[in-house]
Amino acid sequence: MTVLLALDGVACIRGDRLVFEELSLALNRGDALWVRGPNGAGKSSLIRLAAGLLRPAAGRVVRRGRIALIDEAAALDSELPLRRALDFWARVDTVDGHAVDRAMDMMALNTLADVPVAMLSTGQRRRAAMVRVIASGAPIWLLDEPANGMDQAATARLVAAIATHRANGGAVLLASHFALAIPDLDELVMGVLA
């Protein structure tokens, strides 16, 4: 097995609060891990640590391959039409337009290509964020509440995209308050430390 993402004895401190400690995990090609727990348990902090946006207070994080991240913000220019906003990130991520086309089709956003990002619903913005993740070609997906605002059909598309990514050898670390119908999903339950 090829490990794409590993955390070894990781601790996270935010402000003066210990969020979690001695956390270890490994994601191999084809793996998916659902991180769940109450608000404040450290789900988003774990995603940010895995992405390299936070430094662990202890332990180490090893990434083998590029990452693609969804967090609370879609990071799309709200004034641009959706397709132009996605094309900007495609250039940053050095992805060709065909990958964006395929990802937009996968997330059923082609009909919204000319709509300004500011006019999209929350669920549509989450789907747009998934387009960027899918098109990136990154083997490691870090998804923080990716289904927020999505209806049942959009959630099914998200689940299908995750399944395709895993079948192609990718790994997914998914933080979510609610379960998604993803087969063979490992689970990490995080709690609040006293």
Curated annotation (Swiss-Prot):
Cited Pfam families: ABC_tran (PF00005)
The UniProt record lists the keyword Membrane: yes
Protein name from the UniProt record: Cytochrome c biogenesis ATP-binding export protein CcmA
Subunit description: The complex is composed of two ATP-binding proteins (CcmA) and two transmembrane proteins (CcmB).
Residues annotated for ATP binding in this entry: 37-44
Signal peptide feature range: none
Annotated membrane topology: Peripheral membrane protein
Lineage: superkingdom: Bacteria
Gene that specifies this protein: ccmA
Domain (ABC transporter): residue spans on this chain: 5-194
GO CC entries: plasma membrane
Organism: Sphingopyxis alaskensis (strain DSM 13593 / LMG 18877 / RB2256) (Sphingomonas alaskensis)
SMART domains: AAA (SM00382)
Chief location: membrane
Family: Belongs to the ABC transporter superfamily. CcmA exporter (TC 3.A.1.107) family.
Function: Part of the ABC transporter complex CcmAB involved in the biogenesis of c-type cytochromes; once thought to export heme, this seems not to be the case, but its exact role is uncertain. Responsible for energy coupling to the transport system.
InterPro entries linked to this entry: AAA+_ATPase, ABC_transporter-like_ATP-bd, ABC_transptr_haem_export_CcmA, P-loop_NTPase
